[in-house]
Amino acid sequence: MIDSTAVAAGHAKQPFYKHLYFQVLVAIIAGIALGHFYPTFGEQLKPLGDGFIRLVKMIIAPVIFLTVATGIAGMNDMKKVGRVAGKAMIYFLVFSTLALIVGLIVANTVQPGAGMNIDPATLDAKAVATYADKAHEQTITGFLMNIIPTTIVGAFASGDILQVLFFSVLFGIALGIVGEKGKPVTDFMHAMMYPIFKLVAILMKAAPIGAFGAMAFTIGKYGISSVTNLAMLIGTFYITSALFVFVVLGAVCRYNGFSIVALIRYIKEELLLVLGTSSSEAALPGLMSKMEKAGCKRSVVGLVIPTGYSFNLDGTNIYMTLAALFIAQATGIHLSFGEQILLLLVAMLSSKGAAGITGAGFITLAATLSVVPSVPVAGMALILGIDRFMSECRALTNFVGNAVATIVVARWEGELDQEQLARVLSGKEEFTSIADVDALPASVQPAE
């Protein structure tokens, strides 16, 4: 084991410009400036962002497999697996529904689309046809069946998080059941965690480059001026998401003995990475490592975080109901209380059916509107141009929601070291980055 005091002391001497969060922040600002002043060149930098995200996705499957399988194999009671999963799903259902309700309430109160008086017949339905077609392809049954991989290799080859998680849980249970006979396999997997997380640390060094390219492309392609036309909707969504994080999730954090502000400060590097790349998957390995370092047992971290990436989408849920009512208001369509409840129920189901798909937020909205006849699907053309600017906020809110969920479920299950959590969140035991190799062994230390 590494002396955490010595590690923290080493961090204190590190210049601020060597911290990953500072490098990513500078890269984001530079990307915005380049995209604004040289938009054509900025658009050409898209491969930098895409390449970095692909690099991270490359190692997500082994990180999940090793974390989940070793965590479950180390459980003395296999019933804990079902109990942790059950508590996590209850938490996800409650807060996903709450996020949808918050979106409805804010949309009815602020009415960001009121007064636009847009004729639905003048909207270009072709612009959103691709999203609508993808939405129709998704069903709850199809989604559930897709969790089961056709082959083990196929799950890892496709990088499907839920398929990898499904196999990892079953494999971990099998390892736990065979006991001592499976110990060589468990020891090998523990040993494999060191080079895998070392690889994660190496890849994270490229995070500023990825964030720079992704932000330069976004601003270069869509332009800052495109935001001003629908600033009311964007502002309403950002403020609502911030209130949800600091008020709703903040209250949950206080009830469970920690501060939402301290938690956000602890995961600031991952949040900046999500902001820069618009992909919460890019920060998944870092979040898993930090949650374990914060005192959550590996078995809980391995189950809650990957599952939450598909089922605990607070930001996406706020966006769905808020955007749906915005379209209705902008096109002069009045939705009754009953129609809004229908919208809420459909959104609850469709958000699960479209989980894990690229552009899931927009596709889920298309799926919801296609079932609710009162609101025209073509109305999505109104927000197509600014959706990219709202995707960052969706991803950030989803990310914070999953961090909170992990700690809360770990505490419910009695699998949280609260003293360790307090030390880490107070800064007494610093863990600055997944890219900080010195800190990694403590978070992947084999179970005694």
Curated annotation (Swiss-Prot):
SUPFAM superfamilies: Proton glutamate symport protein
Annotated keywords: Cell inner membrane, Cell membrane, Membrane, Symport, Transmembrane, Transmembrane helix, Transport
Membrane-crossing segments per the record: 20-38, 53-75, 88-110, 161-178, 199-220, 230-252, 325-347, 362-384
UniProt topology in membrane: Multi-pass membrane protein
GO cellular component, one term: plasma membrane
Protein location: Cell inner membrane
Main function: Responsible for the transport of dicarboxylates such as succinate, fumarate, and malate from the periplasm across the membrane.
Family statement: Belongs to the dicarboxylate/amino acid:cation symporter (DAACS) (TC 2.A.23) family.
UniProt protein name: C4-dicarboxylate transport protein
